[in-house]
Every structure is written in C-alpha cells, then in structure tokens.
C-alpha cells in the first residue's frame, strides 16, 4: 500500500506511526474499540509506504513517484478526491480485470455541462450493462469536444508499463501530467481498457 502525500499532509502518516499517542490514549481510556483500532493500524503499518509529491504537477507525476515500489504487472490506484462509501467498486473492478486480463477504470455518467471537470471516455464495445471496452479518454474536454458524458472516476487498475509512458509525457492542460493522457497513449498502442460503471 503506497500513500502519495505532500509534506503538508503529515497527519496521514502520523495516523499510522504516532505510537506514543495511541498508547497514551489506550492507557487512559482502556476502551476495547481503541485497542482494536490500534491493532488494525499495527497490522497495516508493515504494508505501507509513503512517497511525497510536494508540487501539484498532476496525477501522472504523482504515480511516477511510486515506480520503484510497483513490482506486479498491474496495480490498483485510488484517488481520495472521489469518495466511494457504499459499494466497494475496487472489488468488482478486480473481478473484471481477472476475467478480461485488461486495465479497468471506474466510471459514472455526468451531466454534459460538467464534462470539462472530468476525464471522459469514448465507448468502443459494450460487454454488459456495466462494462464497456473504450477507445479514447480525453482529459477535461469542452462540451463541443466531448465524446460522451461518461466520466472516469478515481479508481484505476493500470499496467506497470504506464510508467515508461509517463517518463516521456509532456505536461497537458494546466501544465500538469495527467494520468488520462498516459492511458490514451496506451489505448493507441492497442492496450485494452474497460470502463466499469457503478452506482
């Protein structure tokens, strides 16, 4: 598990590493719920690494910071901007990935007037009512340019080879390196991507 944070967000790291704070509370409160939570933290702490992105240079730039830690052929990326509370769409995305041996992105329908706030995908082929092969992703298009109202949400299963694309990628809109631009480059190389709609 890799967290990408800035130096200003040390509180996230402290949540896992501030042992003195937890032990002090446990001693004072003697609440079994706190003890249970602390044991959970100890378990996950061994699996967690932190990398820093101190300048907001885009999601692609942030992902590039994790390269040395990614060993598997594919990895799951979650953006904290998009909170998905009720349904664990990561679980269903992993099922789709295993079935089709493909990269997968979580998606939802957005109002056409709001497309410029999202990465938007173009459908190539319907798999079933919730899953589609895609043949294009455009980062924050105008209403005139948009291929659809299907937005890419912040959950991705991506291939390790995306790092070689990101290393050469030039900044896009807003001077940032966008992960969707790298995805589009992979699609052009005939790499399979599936959009997974969820509610």
Describe each PLM feature range.
Residues 4, 51-54, 154:
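Small/polar loops that bind or transfer phosphate-bearing groups
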Residues 8-9, 82-84, 110-112, 141, ...:
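Glycine-rich beta-alpha junction loops
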Residues 76, 90, 94, 98, ...:
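Catalytic-core segments of class I nucleotidyltransferases/pyrophosphorylases
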Residues 11-14, 22-25, 34-124, 167-169:
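Conserved beta-loop-beta/alpha segment of the NTase-like Rossmann-fold superfamily
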Residues 1-7:
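Short beta-strand/loop segment that forms part of the nucleotide-sugar
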């Amino acid at each position: 598990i890799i967290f990408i944070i800035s130096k200003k967000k040390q509180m996230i790291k402290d949540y896992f590493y501030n042992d003195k704070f937890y032990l002090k509370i446990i001693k004072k409160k003697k609440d079994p719920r706190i003890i249970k939570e602390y044991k959970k933290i100890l378990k996950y702490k061994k699996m967690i690494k932190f990398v820093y992105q101190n300048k907001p240079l885009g999601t692609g730039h942030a992902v590039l910071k994790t390269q040395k830690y990614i060993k598997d052929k594919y990895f799951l990326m979650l953006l904290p901007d998009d909170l998905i509370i009720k349904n664990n769409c990561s679980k269903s995305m992993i099922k789709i990935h295993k079935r089709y041996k493909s990269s997968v992105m979580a998606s939802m329908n957005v109002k056409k007037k709001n497309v410029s706030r999202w990465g938007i995908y173009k459908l190539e082929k319907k798999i079933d009512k919730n899953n589609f092969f895609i043949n294009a992703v455009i980062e924050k298009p105008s209403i005139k340019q948009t291929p659809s109202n299907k937005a890419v949400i912040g959950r991705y299963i991506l291939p390790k080879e995306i790092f070689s694309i990101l290393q050469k990628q030039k900044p896009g809109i807003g001077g940032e390196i966008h992960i969707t631009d790298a995805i589009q480059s992979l699609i052009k190389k005939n790499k399979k991507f599936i959009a997974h709609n969820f509610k």
